[in-house]
DNA sequence: AATGAATGAGGGTTCATTCAT
DNA sequence: GATGAATGAACCCTCATTCAT
């Protein structure tokens, strides 16, 4: 694997582990066993690394976006898709968690970041559109977009705030997906479908 | 107003404006027109300021928490309450936005932070409990808690990610509250109540 | 003596000795026995030190400028005045020697530098004006200004290029002053005065 | 043209444009479209490039020096010769402008540099000797050498300090030559010759 | 001749924090 | 309560230079 790729991979791991602010360019180089000069030969600084990671994340989401029409055929497809989506987000979670810090430390990232956010919003809106095609949600388009935003925000927040820090990443992802599906539950039920495992409702 | 309070107020404003990472102890002192030594006389460092802000936020949420039983009497009470809640969150938004960066820069904040998060979770769960008391939601307690978590995450994310950066703070807050209500809409409707203004549903 | 003054003094000595490019902020701090942080507390960087030195030099020249009308009463006054002038230049010689390097490393100095150069030019022109008042030089004003420029350039160059590097600073200054007077010799002679010690002319 | 020559040419252009200190080995290689490794194959470093440029300049001045006896036949020959001399200096102006910075950054250049300076001094002295042969200057040899030094310094300074930065290079050269001739004017006049265009003298 | 990844020392700068006054 | 000079560690980055290919 080329040095450039190794830098990106290691950076992402370190950024996810300790936050982008806590990881210096030198610590990345040290973790890789390369000299700081070499790091700067491949990327002109931390900002360029982050730009590359943002682009990678954007690309991964773009691929998901393109596959939505094909993959979301029935109500059972939403949970796996949400999981794929959350998996991408989790893989690049540092980008979402440190969003605010990055905004001020690296104004140059603003455009990449807003492009990324726009794409997520599109995915969220398309998700509800597909759901509506399967069975009318009983919402105005405006309400549907609001619901899409809430869904997206809830998903983003599940990447940022770990409610069960003790559980491992995969379990957290599955729980996040379930929580998101609960938001959609009434609409899926209205479509005569309940994708979430049935439990006894209204226990005290 | 005492110097201690002025430090907290100014810090919060600066932290909200430019992020906690971008604001140094010196810049707080400069903004206040006091010497760095004086700042350190009142607070042993940036971490202590943040701890104090976390405590203030926690206190404000505690007050809201205690009033819920009294204030949430009918379905029309939920929107104002959500607004109050979001207003507190918005006032201390730097704490939520820089959560990740703070976690690593100041491990000493971890306990205060998890206490804060727990309280928000309690509020969210109590919110749905009250709703359930008004009219059964048709959810198991576990599903209800998941819904509560989604609601909370959506609220937290609306503090972290500005979807409409051009609008002013108050407008953003109202939109956030509406978005959250959309999440609850099916349950409120099931209770024979629709707190959100009626629009023509299912337009193409 | 205050730290600020000590920084300026030491910087000037080091800059003169080894050139502005060869002296780092750290080496100044080390030479003074202070920490780099303290250096940056007093000056935001090397550029601010240089700006302050340029201002000091400008001030010294301004003082000389103001005294010219009073001090240049007769032909015997020119040599001492030239020596004073050269002494100031020699004291700040790093500014003239590294002029080009500074121009590119610190564009912020451009304005201070051009102001300084303008003042030197004014002094040179006033010098010839006074000489002309003592005895007509037989030059058009335009020719007189050209002569003033040549005189100034010759003086500046004597600060930049050491023709006799083995001799000590004071001797070099005196020789420089003599060289400059030789340029003026024909005009002083025409005024019936020969301020330079008489030697036997036109030896083989 | 061989790579070696292209390196020298491009280096000289860049050094003249932005100063020797601001131009790194890498930037020269980039400007040439070659790899840094290739640059170091031809020259062991920036110092060797500068040594080569010093040698080129020295050679050009040597050629001028040898032609002086032949070319300086009459008083009208001095201006064109001065122009040729200044043109060489202007072509290699970075060497003179950054003299001080180079001295400390590259002590290895000291010998080449002092040889160069000595040659210029010889040329300046020979110039006055030829003038004296055309018509006695009325100066002792010592005074004549001092005048030669002043002339040389004035010429060097005109390469280092741009008094009229807005005018193009050729115009600056011509003005510099005129300024130098003004220094010689009294002696040329004394020889019954005025090489500078006559203007009305002693206007107020 | 030429490439380009890699090195490592060093420079400029920031900042949380201390302490004598 | 308050000042402000001082500290020192750490960070980001540049650059001359080397070397395997």
What are these regions (language model features)?
Chain A
Residues 66-94:
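Hydrophobic alpha-helical connector segments
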Residues 89-111, 125-129:
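Amphipathic alpha-helical segments used for helix-helix packing
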Residues 6, 10, 14-52:
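Helix-turn-helix
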Residues 55-61:
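Short, basic, alpha-helical segments at the C-terminal edge of helix-turn-helix-like DNA-binding modules
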Residues 126, 157-204:
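C-terminal peripheral helix-coil segments that are non-catalytic and often amphipathic
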């Amino acid at each position: 694997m080329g040095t450039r790729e190794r830098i990106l991979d290691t950076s992402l791991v370190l950024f996810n582990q300790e936050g982008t602010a806590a990881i210096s360019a030198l610590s990345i180089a040290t973790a890789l066993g390369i000299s700081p000069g070499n790091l700067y030969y491949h990327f002109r600084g931390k900002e360029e690394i982050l730009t590359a990671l943002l682009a990678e994340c954007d690309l991964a989401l773009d691929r998901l976006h393109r596959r939505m029409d094909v993959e979301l055929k029935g109500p059972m497809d939403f949970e796996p898709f949400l999981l794929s989506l959350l998996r991408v987000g989790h893989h690049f979670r540092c980008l979402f968690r440190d969003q605010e810090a990055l905004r001020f430390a690296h104004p140059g990232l603003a455009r990449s970041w807003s492009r990324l956010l726009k794409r997520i919003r599109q995915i969220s809106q398309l998700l509800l559109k597909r759901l509506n095609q399967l069975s009318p949600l009983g919402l105005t388009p405006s309400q549907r977009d609001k619901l899409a935003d809430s869904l997206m925000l809830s998903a983003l927040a599940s990447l940022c705030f770990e409610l069960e820090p003790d559980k491992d990443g995969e379990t957290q992802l599955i729980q996040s997906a379930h929580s998101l599906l609960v938001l959609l539950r009434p609409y899926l039920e209205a479509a005569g479908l309940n994708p979430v495992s049935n439990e006894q409702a209204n226990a005290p």
